[in-house]
Swiss-Prot record:
Record bears the keyword Membrane: no
Catalytic residues in the record: K164
Protein name as annotated: Ribosomal RNA large subunit methyltransferase E
HAMAP family on file: RNA_methyltr_E
Record localization: Cytoplasm
Functional summary from the UniProt entry: Specifically methylates the uridine in position 2552 of 23S rRNA at the 2'-O position of the ribose in the fully assembled 50S ribosomal subunit.
Keyword GTP-binding: no
GO molecular function, one term: rRNA (uridine-2'-O-)-methyltransferase activity
Listed InterPro entries: RNA_methyltr_RlmE, RNA_MeTrfase_FtsJ_dom, rRNA-MeTfrase_E, SAM-dependent_MTases_sf
Reaction(s) this enzyme catalyzes, per UniProt: uridine(2552) in 23S rRNA + S-adenosyl-L-methionine = 2'-O-methyluridine(2552) in 23S rRNA + S-adenosyl-L-homocysteine + H(+)
Keywords: Cytoplasm, Methyltransferase, rRNA processing, S-adenosyl-L-methionine, Transferase
Top EC group: transferase
Enzyme Commission number(s) of this protein: 2.1.1.166
């Protein structure tokens, strides 16, 4: 029965994907994923990235967010991206492939950042979903906690943070931790985020720790 459910669910996802307005629009605009529209919508509302800024993009593959970030940061800016999956090169993006949960990968990422502080940390990271909430939610919360730790290590005063979080156990505590670190925290559900998804984006500005 579970195999049939998974098959039905997969079929539904594929149908949704190919019928999806944002998938078609991303292909038309030469964007690597529909996720690009999420950061684009956030940028329109919150103006996180400006020319000359340094941006770290966690969970970057296939590159939708990095495409938008490098365009906004411009030639004087810098985008450093990381993902466990490979990513085709993007002009102006310094990409590191590796598991962000591993200390050696974190250290390699910090090396690429160097002594300069980062203006914006972006995280669209998500674990491989098993479909079991009791397994998936803790994994997802662990990743967003690592992203917040990254902010504490590299973010400049008054810097910004945009992170995908799945609503569920641990969400309220995480929101509290983000509020302690930033002056303003807003919850965004972009139009391009699928309605039935539990994902929301926390957009935090004014880093103060």
């Amino acid at each position: 029965m579970s195999g049939k459910k998974r098959t039905a669910s997969s079929t539904r996802w594929m149908q949704e994907h190919f019928d999806d307005h944002y998938v078609k629009l991303s292909q038309k605009r030469g964007l690597r994923s529909r996720a690009a529209f999420k950061i684009e919508e956030i940028q329109q509302k919150d103006k996180l990235i400006r020319p000359g800024m340094t941006v770290v993009d966690l969970g970057a593959a296939p590159g939708g967010w990095s495409q938008i970030a490098v365009k906004l940061a411009g030639e004087t800016g810098k985008v450093i991206a990381c993902d466990i999956l490979p990513m085709d090169p993007i002009v102006g993006v310094d990409f590191l492939q590796g598991d962000f949960r591993e200390e050696k990968v974190l250290n390699a990422l910090l090396e690429r950042v160097g002594d300069a502080k980062v203006d914006v940390v972006l995280s669209d990271m998500a674990p491989n979903m098993s479909g079991t909430g009791g397994v998936d939610q803790p994994r997802a919360m662990y990743l967003v906690e690592l992203a917040l730790d990254m902010c504490h290590q590299v973010l400049a005063p008054n810097g910004s943070f945009a992170v995908k979080v799945f609503q569920g156990e641990g969400f309220d505590e995480y929101m509290k931790a983000v509020r302690e670190a930033f002056t303003t925290v807003k919850t965004r559900k972009p139009d391009s985020s699928r309605p039935r998804s539990r994902e929301v984006y926390l957009v935090a500005t004014g880093y103060k720790l």
